[in-house]
Structures are given as structure tokens and as C-alpha cells.
Amino acid sequence: MTLSDIPVAVRKNRVGTVGEWRAVGITPAQFRSLTRAGALVRVRRGVYATRSAVESAGADPRQDHALRAAVARVAVGRHAVASHQSAAVLHGIDLLKKPAEGVVWLTRPPGQKCGRPFEGIHLYSAQLPEKHVTTLYGVRVTTATRTVVDLARSLTYMEGVVAVDSALRVGKMTDFGLADVLRSCARWPGADRARRAANFGSADAESVLESCARVVFAEAGLPRPVLQAAIATAEAEFIARVDFCWPAYQVIAEADGMAKYDEPRRARDQIMRDIRLRDAGYKVVHFTWGELFGTPERVIARIRGAFAAPTSY
């Protein structure tokens, strides 16, 4: 026997306990046959998943996390949904810190009976309006907007900005939708921090490093830069689109990620690009991950120095 022999309504259950599989119509004899054939695979004591769910998890990190979240929901209770970092993984929202391997984040409504969470489950209790919940990879999960608000409430301000910027950049949420969820959570712990991150968010920050730099610049009291500014020569010939620009000072700052110059050709192209920017009268400051988090005061000092320097070299 294979799952194709079972009604479609039953096959939609990707993960369940023995009792849950029987509740959707699989008889004890069918269950034994399906497990012997490998159509249902034991993923935890008393919990079985379809072979397709297990195979998908092995080929796709998001599917893998979805399967882990589904198993965790079985343990905690079906009223719980994937949230916070787990929801960010499923939605493809960037995080400053990579989620711990094998850990799942869930939220359940207050007052609901809770099963016994196993090690590796972070369980939150909060209201879950139906409009804040969706389904991804067969798992109930908070919407992208609710996910961002939860992250911004529970993590640091910088981590919240990273999530807000990422979700805006990839079109996972809108300013209007964000404001609506913030109103729903206005009295919750961390709501003020989430509101600050939301107000500071920008779809124009193109990487986690750029989002973090925006926070560092603002906290140092630098003027707010223009993001992804298009720079041209006096003859209106396009030169480049730059990460940060302060037009009043003719200063550019570039966030150099780890993969930005991983090829000699790309490094040479960057040198030539900088020469053209300087020929156009701009002062260019580069900084890396290590500098921004290790010696941020030096990055700020270089930018302030560029503000004060003559326009052309």
C-alpha cells in the first residue's frame, strides 16, 4: 500500500501522531502497511510523517524547518503556530543571527492546553488573530508582517531593523500592513521597540550589513544617508549605484560584505569604480562586517573625516 491508495483529504496531513492518522481515516491495518512500505516515516516517538515530507526536507532547508515545526506542533498542540525565527526562515526573512540548529519557535494562544514541549522548542504565548496566521509548506505560521513585529518585539533593536528592512525589500509586507499589526500589539511587551524599528525600516537597504550600518550611523548621530543613490558624472553619465550617500558632503560609504570581492576581477572593477566616483568629486569610505561590529567608532570617524575633507582629492 502507498499513500496514493489513501483519499487525498487524508494525504494532506504531512505529520501526525498515530492517533491523528487514524482519526483522518487510516485503519490500523493500513497504518501498519504504510509504515512497512515507507510511505509513513517515524520522525519522533509516536509521530509519523509522509515520505514526501521527509524527502522534501532533505532537499530544501525551508522544507526541513517546516517539518521540524510540524513535529513540534504535534508535541505542543495544533493550536500553536510557527513564529519568530522559525517563521522568518519559512518566509525567507533575513536575520542578523542564524537560528540555532534544530531549534523551533512556536506561539500558542493564552489559555490553551499545552502538550509537553521537547528540547529545542521555544514556546511563546500571545494572541493569534486569524488574520495574523497563514500556511507555508503545509505548516501554520504567523504572517510575514506579524513575524517581523514579533521579532522586533523580542530581539534587539538592530535585529528588529534587519527583519523590517528585509521584509520590506522582498515585498513580504507593506507599511500599511505593518502599522495594522503594530496597533494590534500596541500593549504587548517590546511593542515600543518594534514601533521604533518599523518607523526606521527601509526597503532600500539591500543586505543585513547595510541594515546594521544604518543603525550604527543613526546611533552615532550621523545625518540620515540616501540609500542606493545613483551617481553620475557632470555630463549625466551613470557611474554607479552606491550603498550610502550624503550628497551635501559628497561622501559615499560602501558596505563590503564577505562575498563582495571574492574574485580578482570584481576587486579590480571596484577599484576602477572608486576612481570614477572620486573623479566625479565624491569621497568614498569602505567598511566591513568586522569593522562595523569590532571598531564602529573607526568607521564613524572615517565618515566624519570625509565630511570635513575637501570635495576633491
Segments from the language model and where they lie:
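Short gly/ser-rich loop at a beta-strand->alpha-helix junction or flexible surface loop bordering the NTP-binding
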Residues: 1-190, 308-313
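Surface segments flanking catalytic/ligand-binding clefts of nucleic-acid enzymes
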Residues: 1-4, 8-12, 20, 25-29, ...
